[in-house]
UniProtKB/Swiss-Prot annotation:
Species of the source: Burkholderia mallei (strain ATCC 23344)
Family as reported in the entry's similarity comment: Belongs to the TrpC family.
UniProt entry keywords in alphabetical sequence: Amino-acid biosynthesis, Aromatic amino acid biosynthesis, Decarboxylase, Lyase, Tryptophan biosynthesis
Superkingdom, taxonomy of origin: Bacteria
Transmembrane segments: none
Presence of keyword Nucleotide-binding: no
Gene Ontology MF annotations: indole-3-glycerol-phosphate synthase activity; phosphoribosylanthranilate isomerase activity
Pathway assigned in UniProt: Amino-acid biosynthesis; L-tryptophan biosynthesis; L-tryptophan from chorismate: step 4/5
The enzyme's E.C. designation: 4.1.1.48
InterPro entries reported for this sequence: Aldolase_TIM, Indole-3-glycerol_P_synth, Indole-3-glycerol_P_synth_dom, Indole-3-GlycerolPSynthase_CS, RibuloseP-bd_barrel
GO BP annotations listed: L-tryptophan biosynthetic process
Protein name: Indole-3-glycerol phosphate synthase
Length: 261
């Protein structure tokens, strides 16, 4: 595991310990059970069935590698813009320390539209899955680089029991081999190396031959132009998680439409 990832995971464990003090497990279970759910898997499949790219549009203020991406950051407005311009789902960063995200941002974005929402964070404990449901998430991300396989399998099973869809993220073939032991149909290939934060979309293109036909590839990070989209679609990839390109645009939803539709 990288120094950066090590640091993030250590902070996550500190945050979970503190959260358990302020919101005990049983209290969080009550909050989680009160939330309705939206069909994350169905929203992506519906786009495919209609012959369109399925875009998971990200609400992200900043990143460790790029700094602040959007100074005027209003999650509700961004979510509405995405919904109006053809996004299938939202992804909202909830990590505060490294990405300047917030659970409030997820709640605000979800309340502003009818799209299903992925909680984008570094999940290392089942408590975070209850947090995700309590804040209104419909799906969560499991990062293979941050988890051993038995824990990843256990977290997926618990997520599904809570009604959360799962996107498992990999960056290399070793991680892919482990990720394919999960049941989720969605395999995210992160074009950004979490060890170095270097990015190339060739990462996705170079791993496609190892993905079984019953899995849906989600290409993540580094999709910055219409040309990038066309390269992916020519290779048979039709599901995208995009944040930076939209966040840097004056109108995020209009940029989504320009790149994809």
């Amino acid at each position: 595991m990288s120094d950066i990832l090590d640091k993030i995971i250590a902070v996550k464990r500190e945050e979970i310990a503190a959260a358990l003090e302020s919101a005990p497990l049983e209290e969080l279970k009550v909050q989680a059970s009160a939330r309705d759910s939206r069909d994350f898997v169905g929203a992506l499949r519906d786009k495919h069935a209609a012959g369109h790219a399925a875009v998971i549009a990200e609400v992200k203020k900043a990143s460790p590698s790029k700094g602040v991406l959007r100074e005027h950051f209003v999650p509700a407005d961004i979510a509405r813009s995405y919904a109006q311009h053809g996004a299938a789902c939202l992804s909202v960063l909830t990590d505060e320390r490294f990405f300047q995200g917030s659970a409030r941002y997820l709640e605000q974005a979800r309340a502003a539209c009818t799209l299903p929402v992925l909680r984008k964070d570094f999940i290392v404990d089942a408590y975070q899955l209850l947090e995700a449901r309590a804040m209104g998430a419909d799906a969560i991300l499991l990062i293979a680089a941050a988890l051993d396989t038995p824990l990843m399998i256990d977290l997926e099973a618990y997520a599904h029991s809570l009604g959360l869809a799962v996107l498992v993220e990999v960056h290399n073939r070793g991680e892919l081999d482990e990720a394919l032991k999960l049941k989720t149909p969605f395999v995210g290939i992160n074009n950004r190396n979490l060890r170095t934060f270097e990015t190339t979309i060739d990462t996705t293109l170079g791993m496609l031959d190892a993905i079984p036909d019953d899995r849906i590839v989600v290409t993540e990070s580094g999709i910055l132009s219409r040309a990038d989209v066309e390269r992916m679609e020519a290779a048979g990839v039709h599901t995208f998680l995009v944040g930076e390109a939209f966040m840097r645009a004056e109108n995020p939803g209009a940029e989504l439409a320009r790149m994809f539709f």
